[in-house]
Curated annotation (Swiss-Prot):
This is Probable alpha-L-glutamate ligase. Pfam families: RimK (PF08443), Rimk_N (PF18030). ATP binds at K141, E178, Y179, D187, R211, S212, N213. GO terms for cellular component: cytoplasm. Residues 104-287 form the ATP-grasp domain. HAMAP family: RimK. Mg(2+) 2 binds at E260, N262. SUPFAM superfamilies: Glutathione synthetase ATP-binding domain-like.
Length: 300
């Protein structure tokens, strides 16, 4: 198969592992910077150009699109979809997952358990918003944030009001969520490929920090998950239309809660912690699904 990876940096661990896994299976694979692509949106003969050359059709495309380039990156991915390339995560699914508010609403519609979450526009509603999620301590999140950026733990009501006002002063869209104290700064990252959880790790925040992201100094260990956690992870990924996803689960006293669904999960932490070949599982999935005649779930 002829495969493209959409990524700004082919030297990143995840990209290098995907290239390695594809080449080991005899596939041709190329890393393409989506910001260097430009398109002819023509119903008769659509094309994609890259650094002065017209790209030929690829059998499959693996999007590794960072949050900062979601708009243009998914536009490029849609053009590949238009040309008939199989996307490992469709453009529509990625945009759903990148919008934290929309994704939580979709998950809630399917009855998936979540931390209690509030969203409001008017400063006049701040007091009620804080009460809706059970009061302080609580978590304030930027809707557009990733890797723990724009996530603040407010331990008192006064701190919560100050943080919310500060974000509003920047015209930022924010979510207010209950703080799951019993999780003690840890979460479970489930790596979903297709309809299976292929790996799971527990991430623990560093001392003095509540965000467990590995990019923020958190640590990881291999962990066994329950049947309920496995089912909720697969259901969350399926609800957003993602073939590959990192589903982050908080172990609360009332049961597992989906905190976030990541459409472009990093492979380094999961592979190094578990010793599993996740990149290989992703390429195998492409081999199974990326055949001529496939249909987009969403219509593109």
């Amino acid at each position: 198969m002829k495969i493209a990876i959409l990524s700004r940096d082919g030297t990143l661990y995840s990209c290098k592992r995907l290239v390695e896994a594809a080449e080991q299976r005899g596939h041709s694979i190329e890393v393409i910077d989506p910001l260097s692509c430009y398109m002819n949106i023509n119903p008769a003969a659509p094309t994609i150009h890259y650094r002065g050359r017209q790209l030929e059709r690829y059998d499959a495309v693996i999007p590794r699109i960072g949050s900062a380039m979601t708009f243009y990156g998914t536009a490029v991915l849609r053009q590949f979809e238009l040309l008939g390339s199989y996307p490992l995560n469709e453009s529509v699914a990625i945009t759903r997952a990148r919008d934290k508010l929309r994704s939580l609403q979709l998950l809630a519609r399917q009855g998936i358990d979540l931390p209690i979450t509030g969203f409001a526009h008017s400063p006049d509603d701040t007091g009620d918003l804080i009460e809706l999620v059970g009061g302080a301590p609580l978590v304030v999140k930027l809707v557009e944030g990733t890797q723990g950026i724009g996530v603040v733990l407010a331990e008192t009501r006064q701190a919560a009001e100050s943080v919310i006002d500060a974000f509003r002063g920047l015209n930022a869209h924010i979510l207010v969520q209950e703080y799951i104290r019993e999780a003690q700064g840890s979460d479970v990252r489930c790596l979903v490929v297709g309809s299976k959880v292929v790996a799971a790790i527990e991430r623990q925040a560093k001392p003095g920090e509540f965000r467990s992201n590995l990019h923020r100094g958190g640590t990881a260990r291999k962990v066994s998950i329950t049947a309920k956690e496995r089912a909720i992870a697969v259901k969350a990924a399926t609800t957003l239309g993602l073939d590959v996803a990192g589903v982050d689960i908080l172990r609360a006293a009332r049961g597992p809660l989906v905190m976030e669904v990541n459409a472009s999960p990093g492979l380094e932490g999961v592979e190094s912690t578990t010793g599993l070949d996740i990149a290989g599982r992703m390429i195998e999935y492409i081999e199974q699904r990326g055949r001529p005649g496939f249909r987009l779930k969403s219509g593109g």
